[in-house]
Amino acid sequence: MKKTVICILSLLLTANISAQVIDYTKPDSLKVMSLFKKAKTLKDKSMSSYMVFFGRQFKGVPYVAKTLEKNANEKLIVNLHQLDCTTYVETVLALSKAMAQHKPTFASYCENLKHIRYRNGKVAYPARQHYFTYWIQENTKEGIVKNIQSPTPPFSATQTVKANYMTTHLESYPMLKGKQQWIKQIADMEKSITGTRQKYIPTKAVTNSNVVRKTVHNGDIIAIVTTKAGLEISHI
């Protein structure tokens, strides 16, 4: 049986808005503005309220993997009509941050998305935070999220990360073909998180108990970790 982990990320706010070139369609930009218009009617203006609200707006959106792999040269892709688990979380978080910053504009959404998805906001394939443990660490440094691994219980087990899936499965990543420098940078990313020890809630402890209800809150991001070789987190 696979081992699972729940990592709770409470959300903090930062502001750093600048203009940029992005890859998007008109329906995507219109949807962003439509969602902002709806969110303005909320009485609860907290970050957690925005996270729950925007999260619910994407019910029924098709699950499509690898929507970020469409360009030979990396671009900031905005796609609200096809989502996987990671792009879903990034989309909801970027929308929520823009509202919490009182900047409900398409430009603000894109700026937030850029800093959530890429290390230091630099749009480049090797800077994309491919491993979610790395995503957590970098977004924690940026003050965008807070990584919570307590109290004990329910965080009663420990996982030691060993990441090498991308560099040992290059055939699954066409963008890396023939790009030795990029491969080295991905290997550096893997090395930086390998050995990380993180507390998690074991499957048997995921129950409708008082301690779990007091630990997991509305708007939290939950990461599920697997024992699959080379990977650390399988779903969010």
Model regions and ranges:
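Function-determining sites in protein domains
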Residues: 42
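Short alpha-helix capping/helix-loop boundary micro-motifs
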Residues: 200-212
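Short, surface-exposed secondary-structure edge patches
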Residues: 211-215, 231
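Sequence/structural signature of beta-propeller domains
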Residues: 47-59, 63, 68
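C-terminal structured interaction module
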Residues: 229-236
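Bacterial Sec-dependent N-terminal signal peptides
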Residues: 1-24
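Acidic/His-rich structured neighborhood in mature extracellular/periplasmic domains
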Residues: 63-199, 217, 222-224, 236
